[in-house]
Amino acid sequence: DRAPDLTLGTTPGPRVLGVDRSAGAGAAGGGTGGTSGGTSGGAPTCDASTTRRVSESRIGWGVKDSFRSYIRGSVAKGSWTTDGAVENGGAFIFSGAEGAVDTSGPRGTVAARGSVTFTGHGGTLRTVVADPEVTFSGGTGTLTADVTSNDTQGTPHAYGRIAVADLTVTASVDGGVLDGTAEATLTQAGANALSDFYEPGTVMSPVSVRAALAGAADCGALDGSGATGAGTAGSTPDVASLGALPADGSSAP
């Protein structure tokens, strides 16, 4: 599992964050160097003078290499499709123009739109991950998304908007552009929604985020939409039990 490069290959649109960095420094509060930023002691505060809205964004995430291998392997015999996102180098790239970043940290929220749908086992397995959002502050963060998964009977369960993964974030702002990468570990809600393929705390594919920053933003936008779903769907949809996984794990997620 590796972090996707959001500037190379096929991109969702005619340009990849077409930002004039030389002109953007003043508008976005200048650069923060290569540090991840953060606060110490208590909750972070918002500096309205350095808070900027997201005018264009990319979020890249591959879920997990072994999960994708399982979907297309001899057990699940499945595939995946995207809607409003593109596949690039083992990751799914979502695009948008939502969020806000305090460049003095940096901290904030970057949101994107689109979905990826995984299917397998003749359609019994079906998992949809949609509209991801990365919220970060002080080197930590959360990957939030809308997730729907089928149970072993093929009945869909809507988990709602949940915190899929906890993030360890490294981010910087330079010339009006936020660049960040994050290590991702699966939450309990994320494990439930991904059909219990992985235990909570499992290291997932890394997340990449890139955003062009423009004019002033409301400090309230820094926190994003947050997780509003319950993170459970009434039963454990143990779709992993559908396949007789080999002992060597070659086709296992």
Residue ranges and their predicted role:
Residues 1-253:
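Primarily mature extracellular domains of secreted and cell-surface proteins
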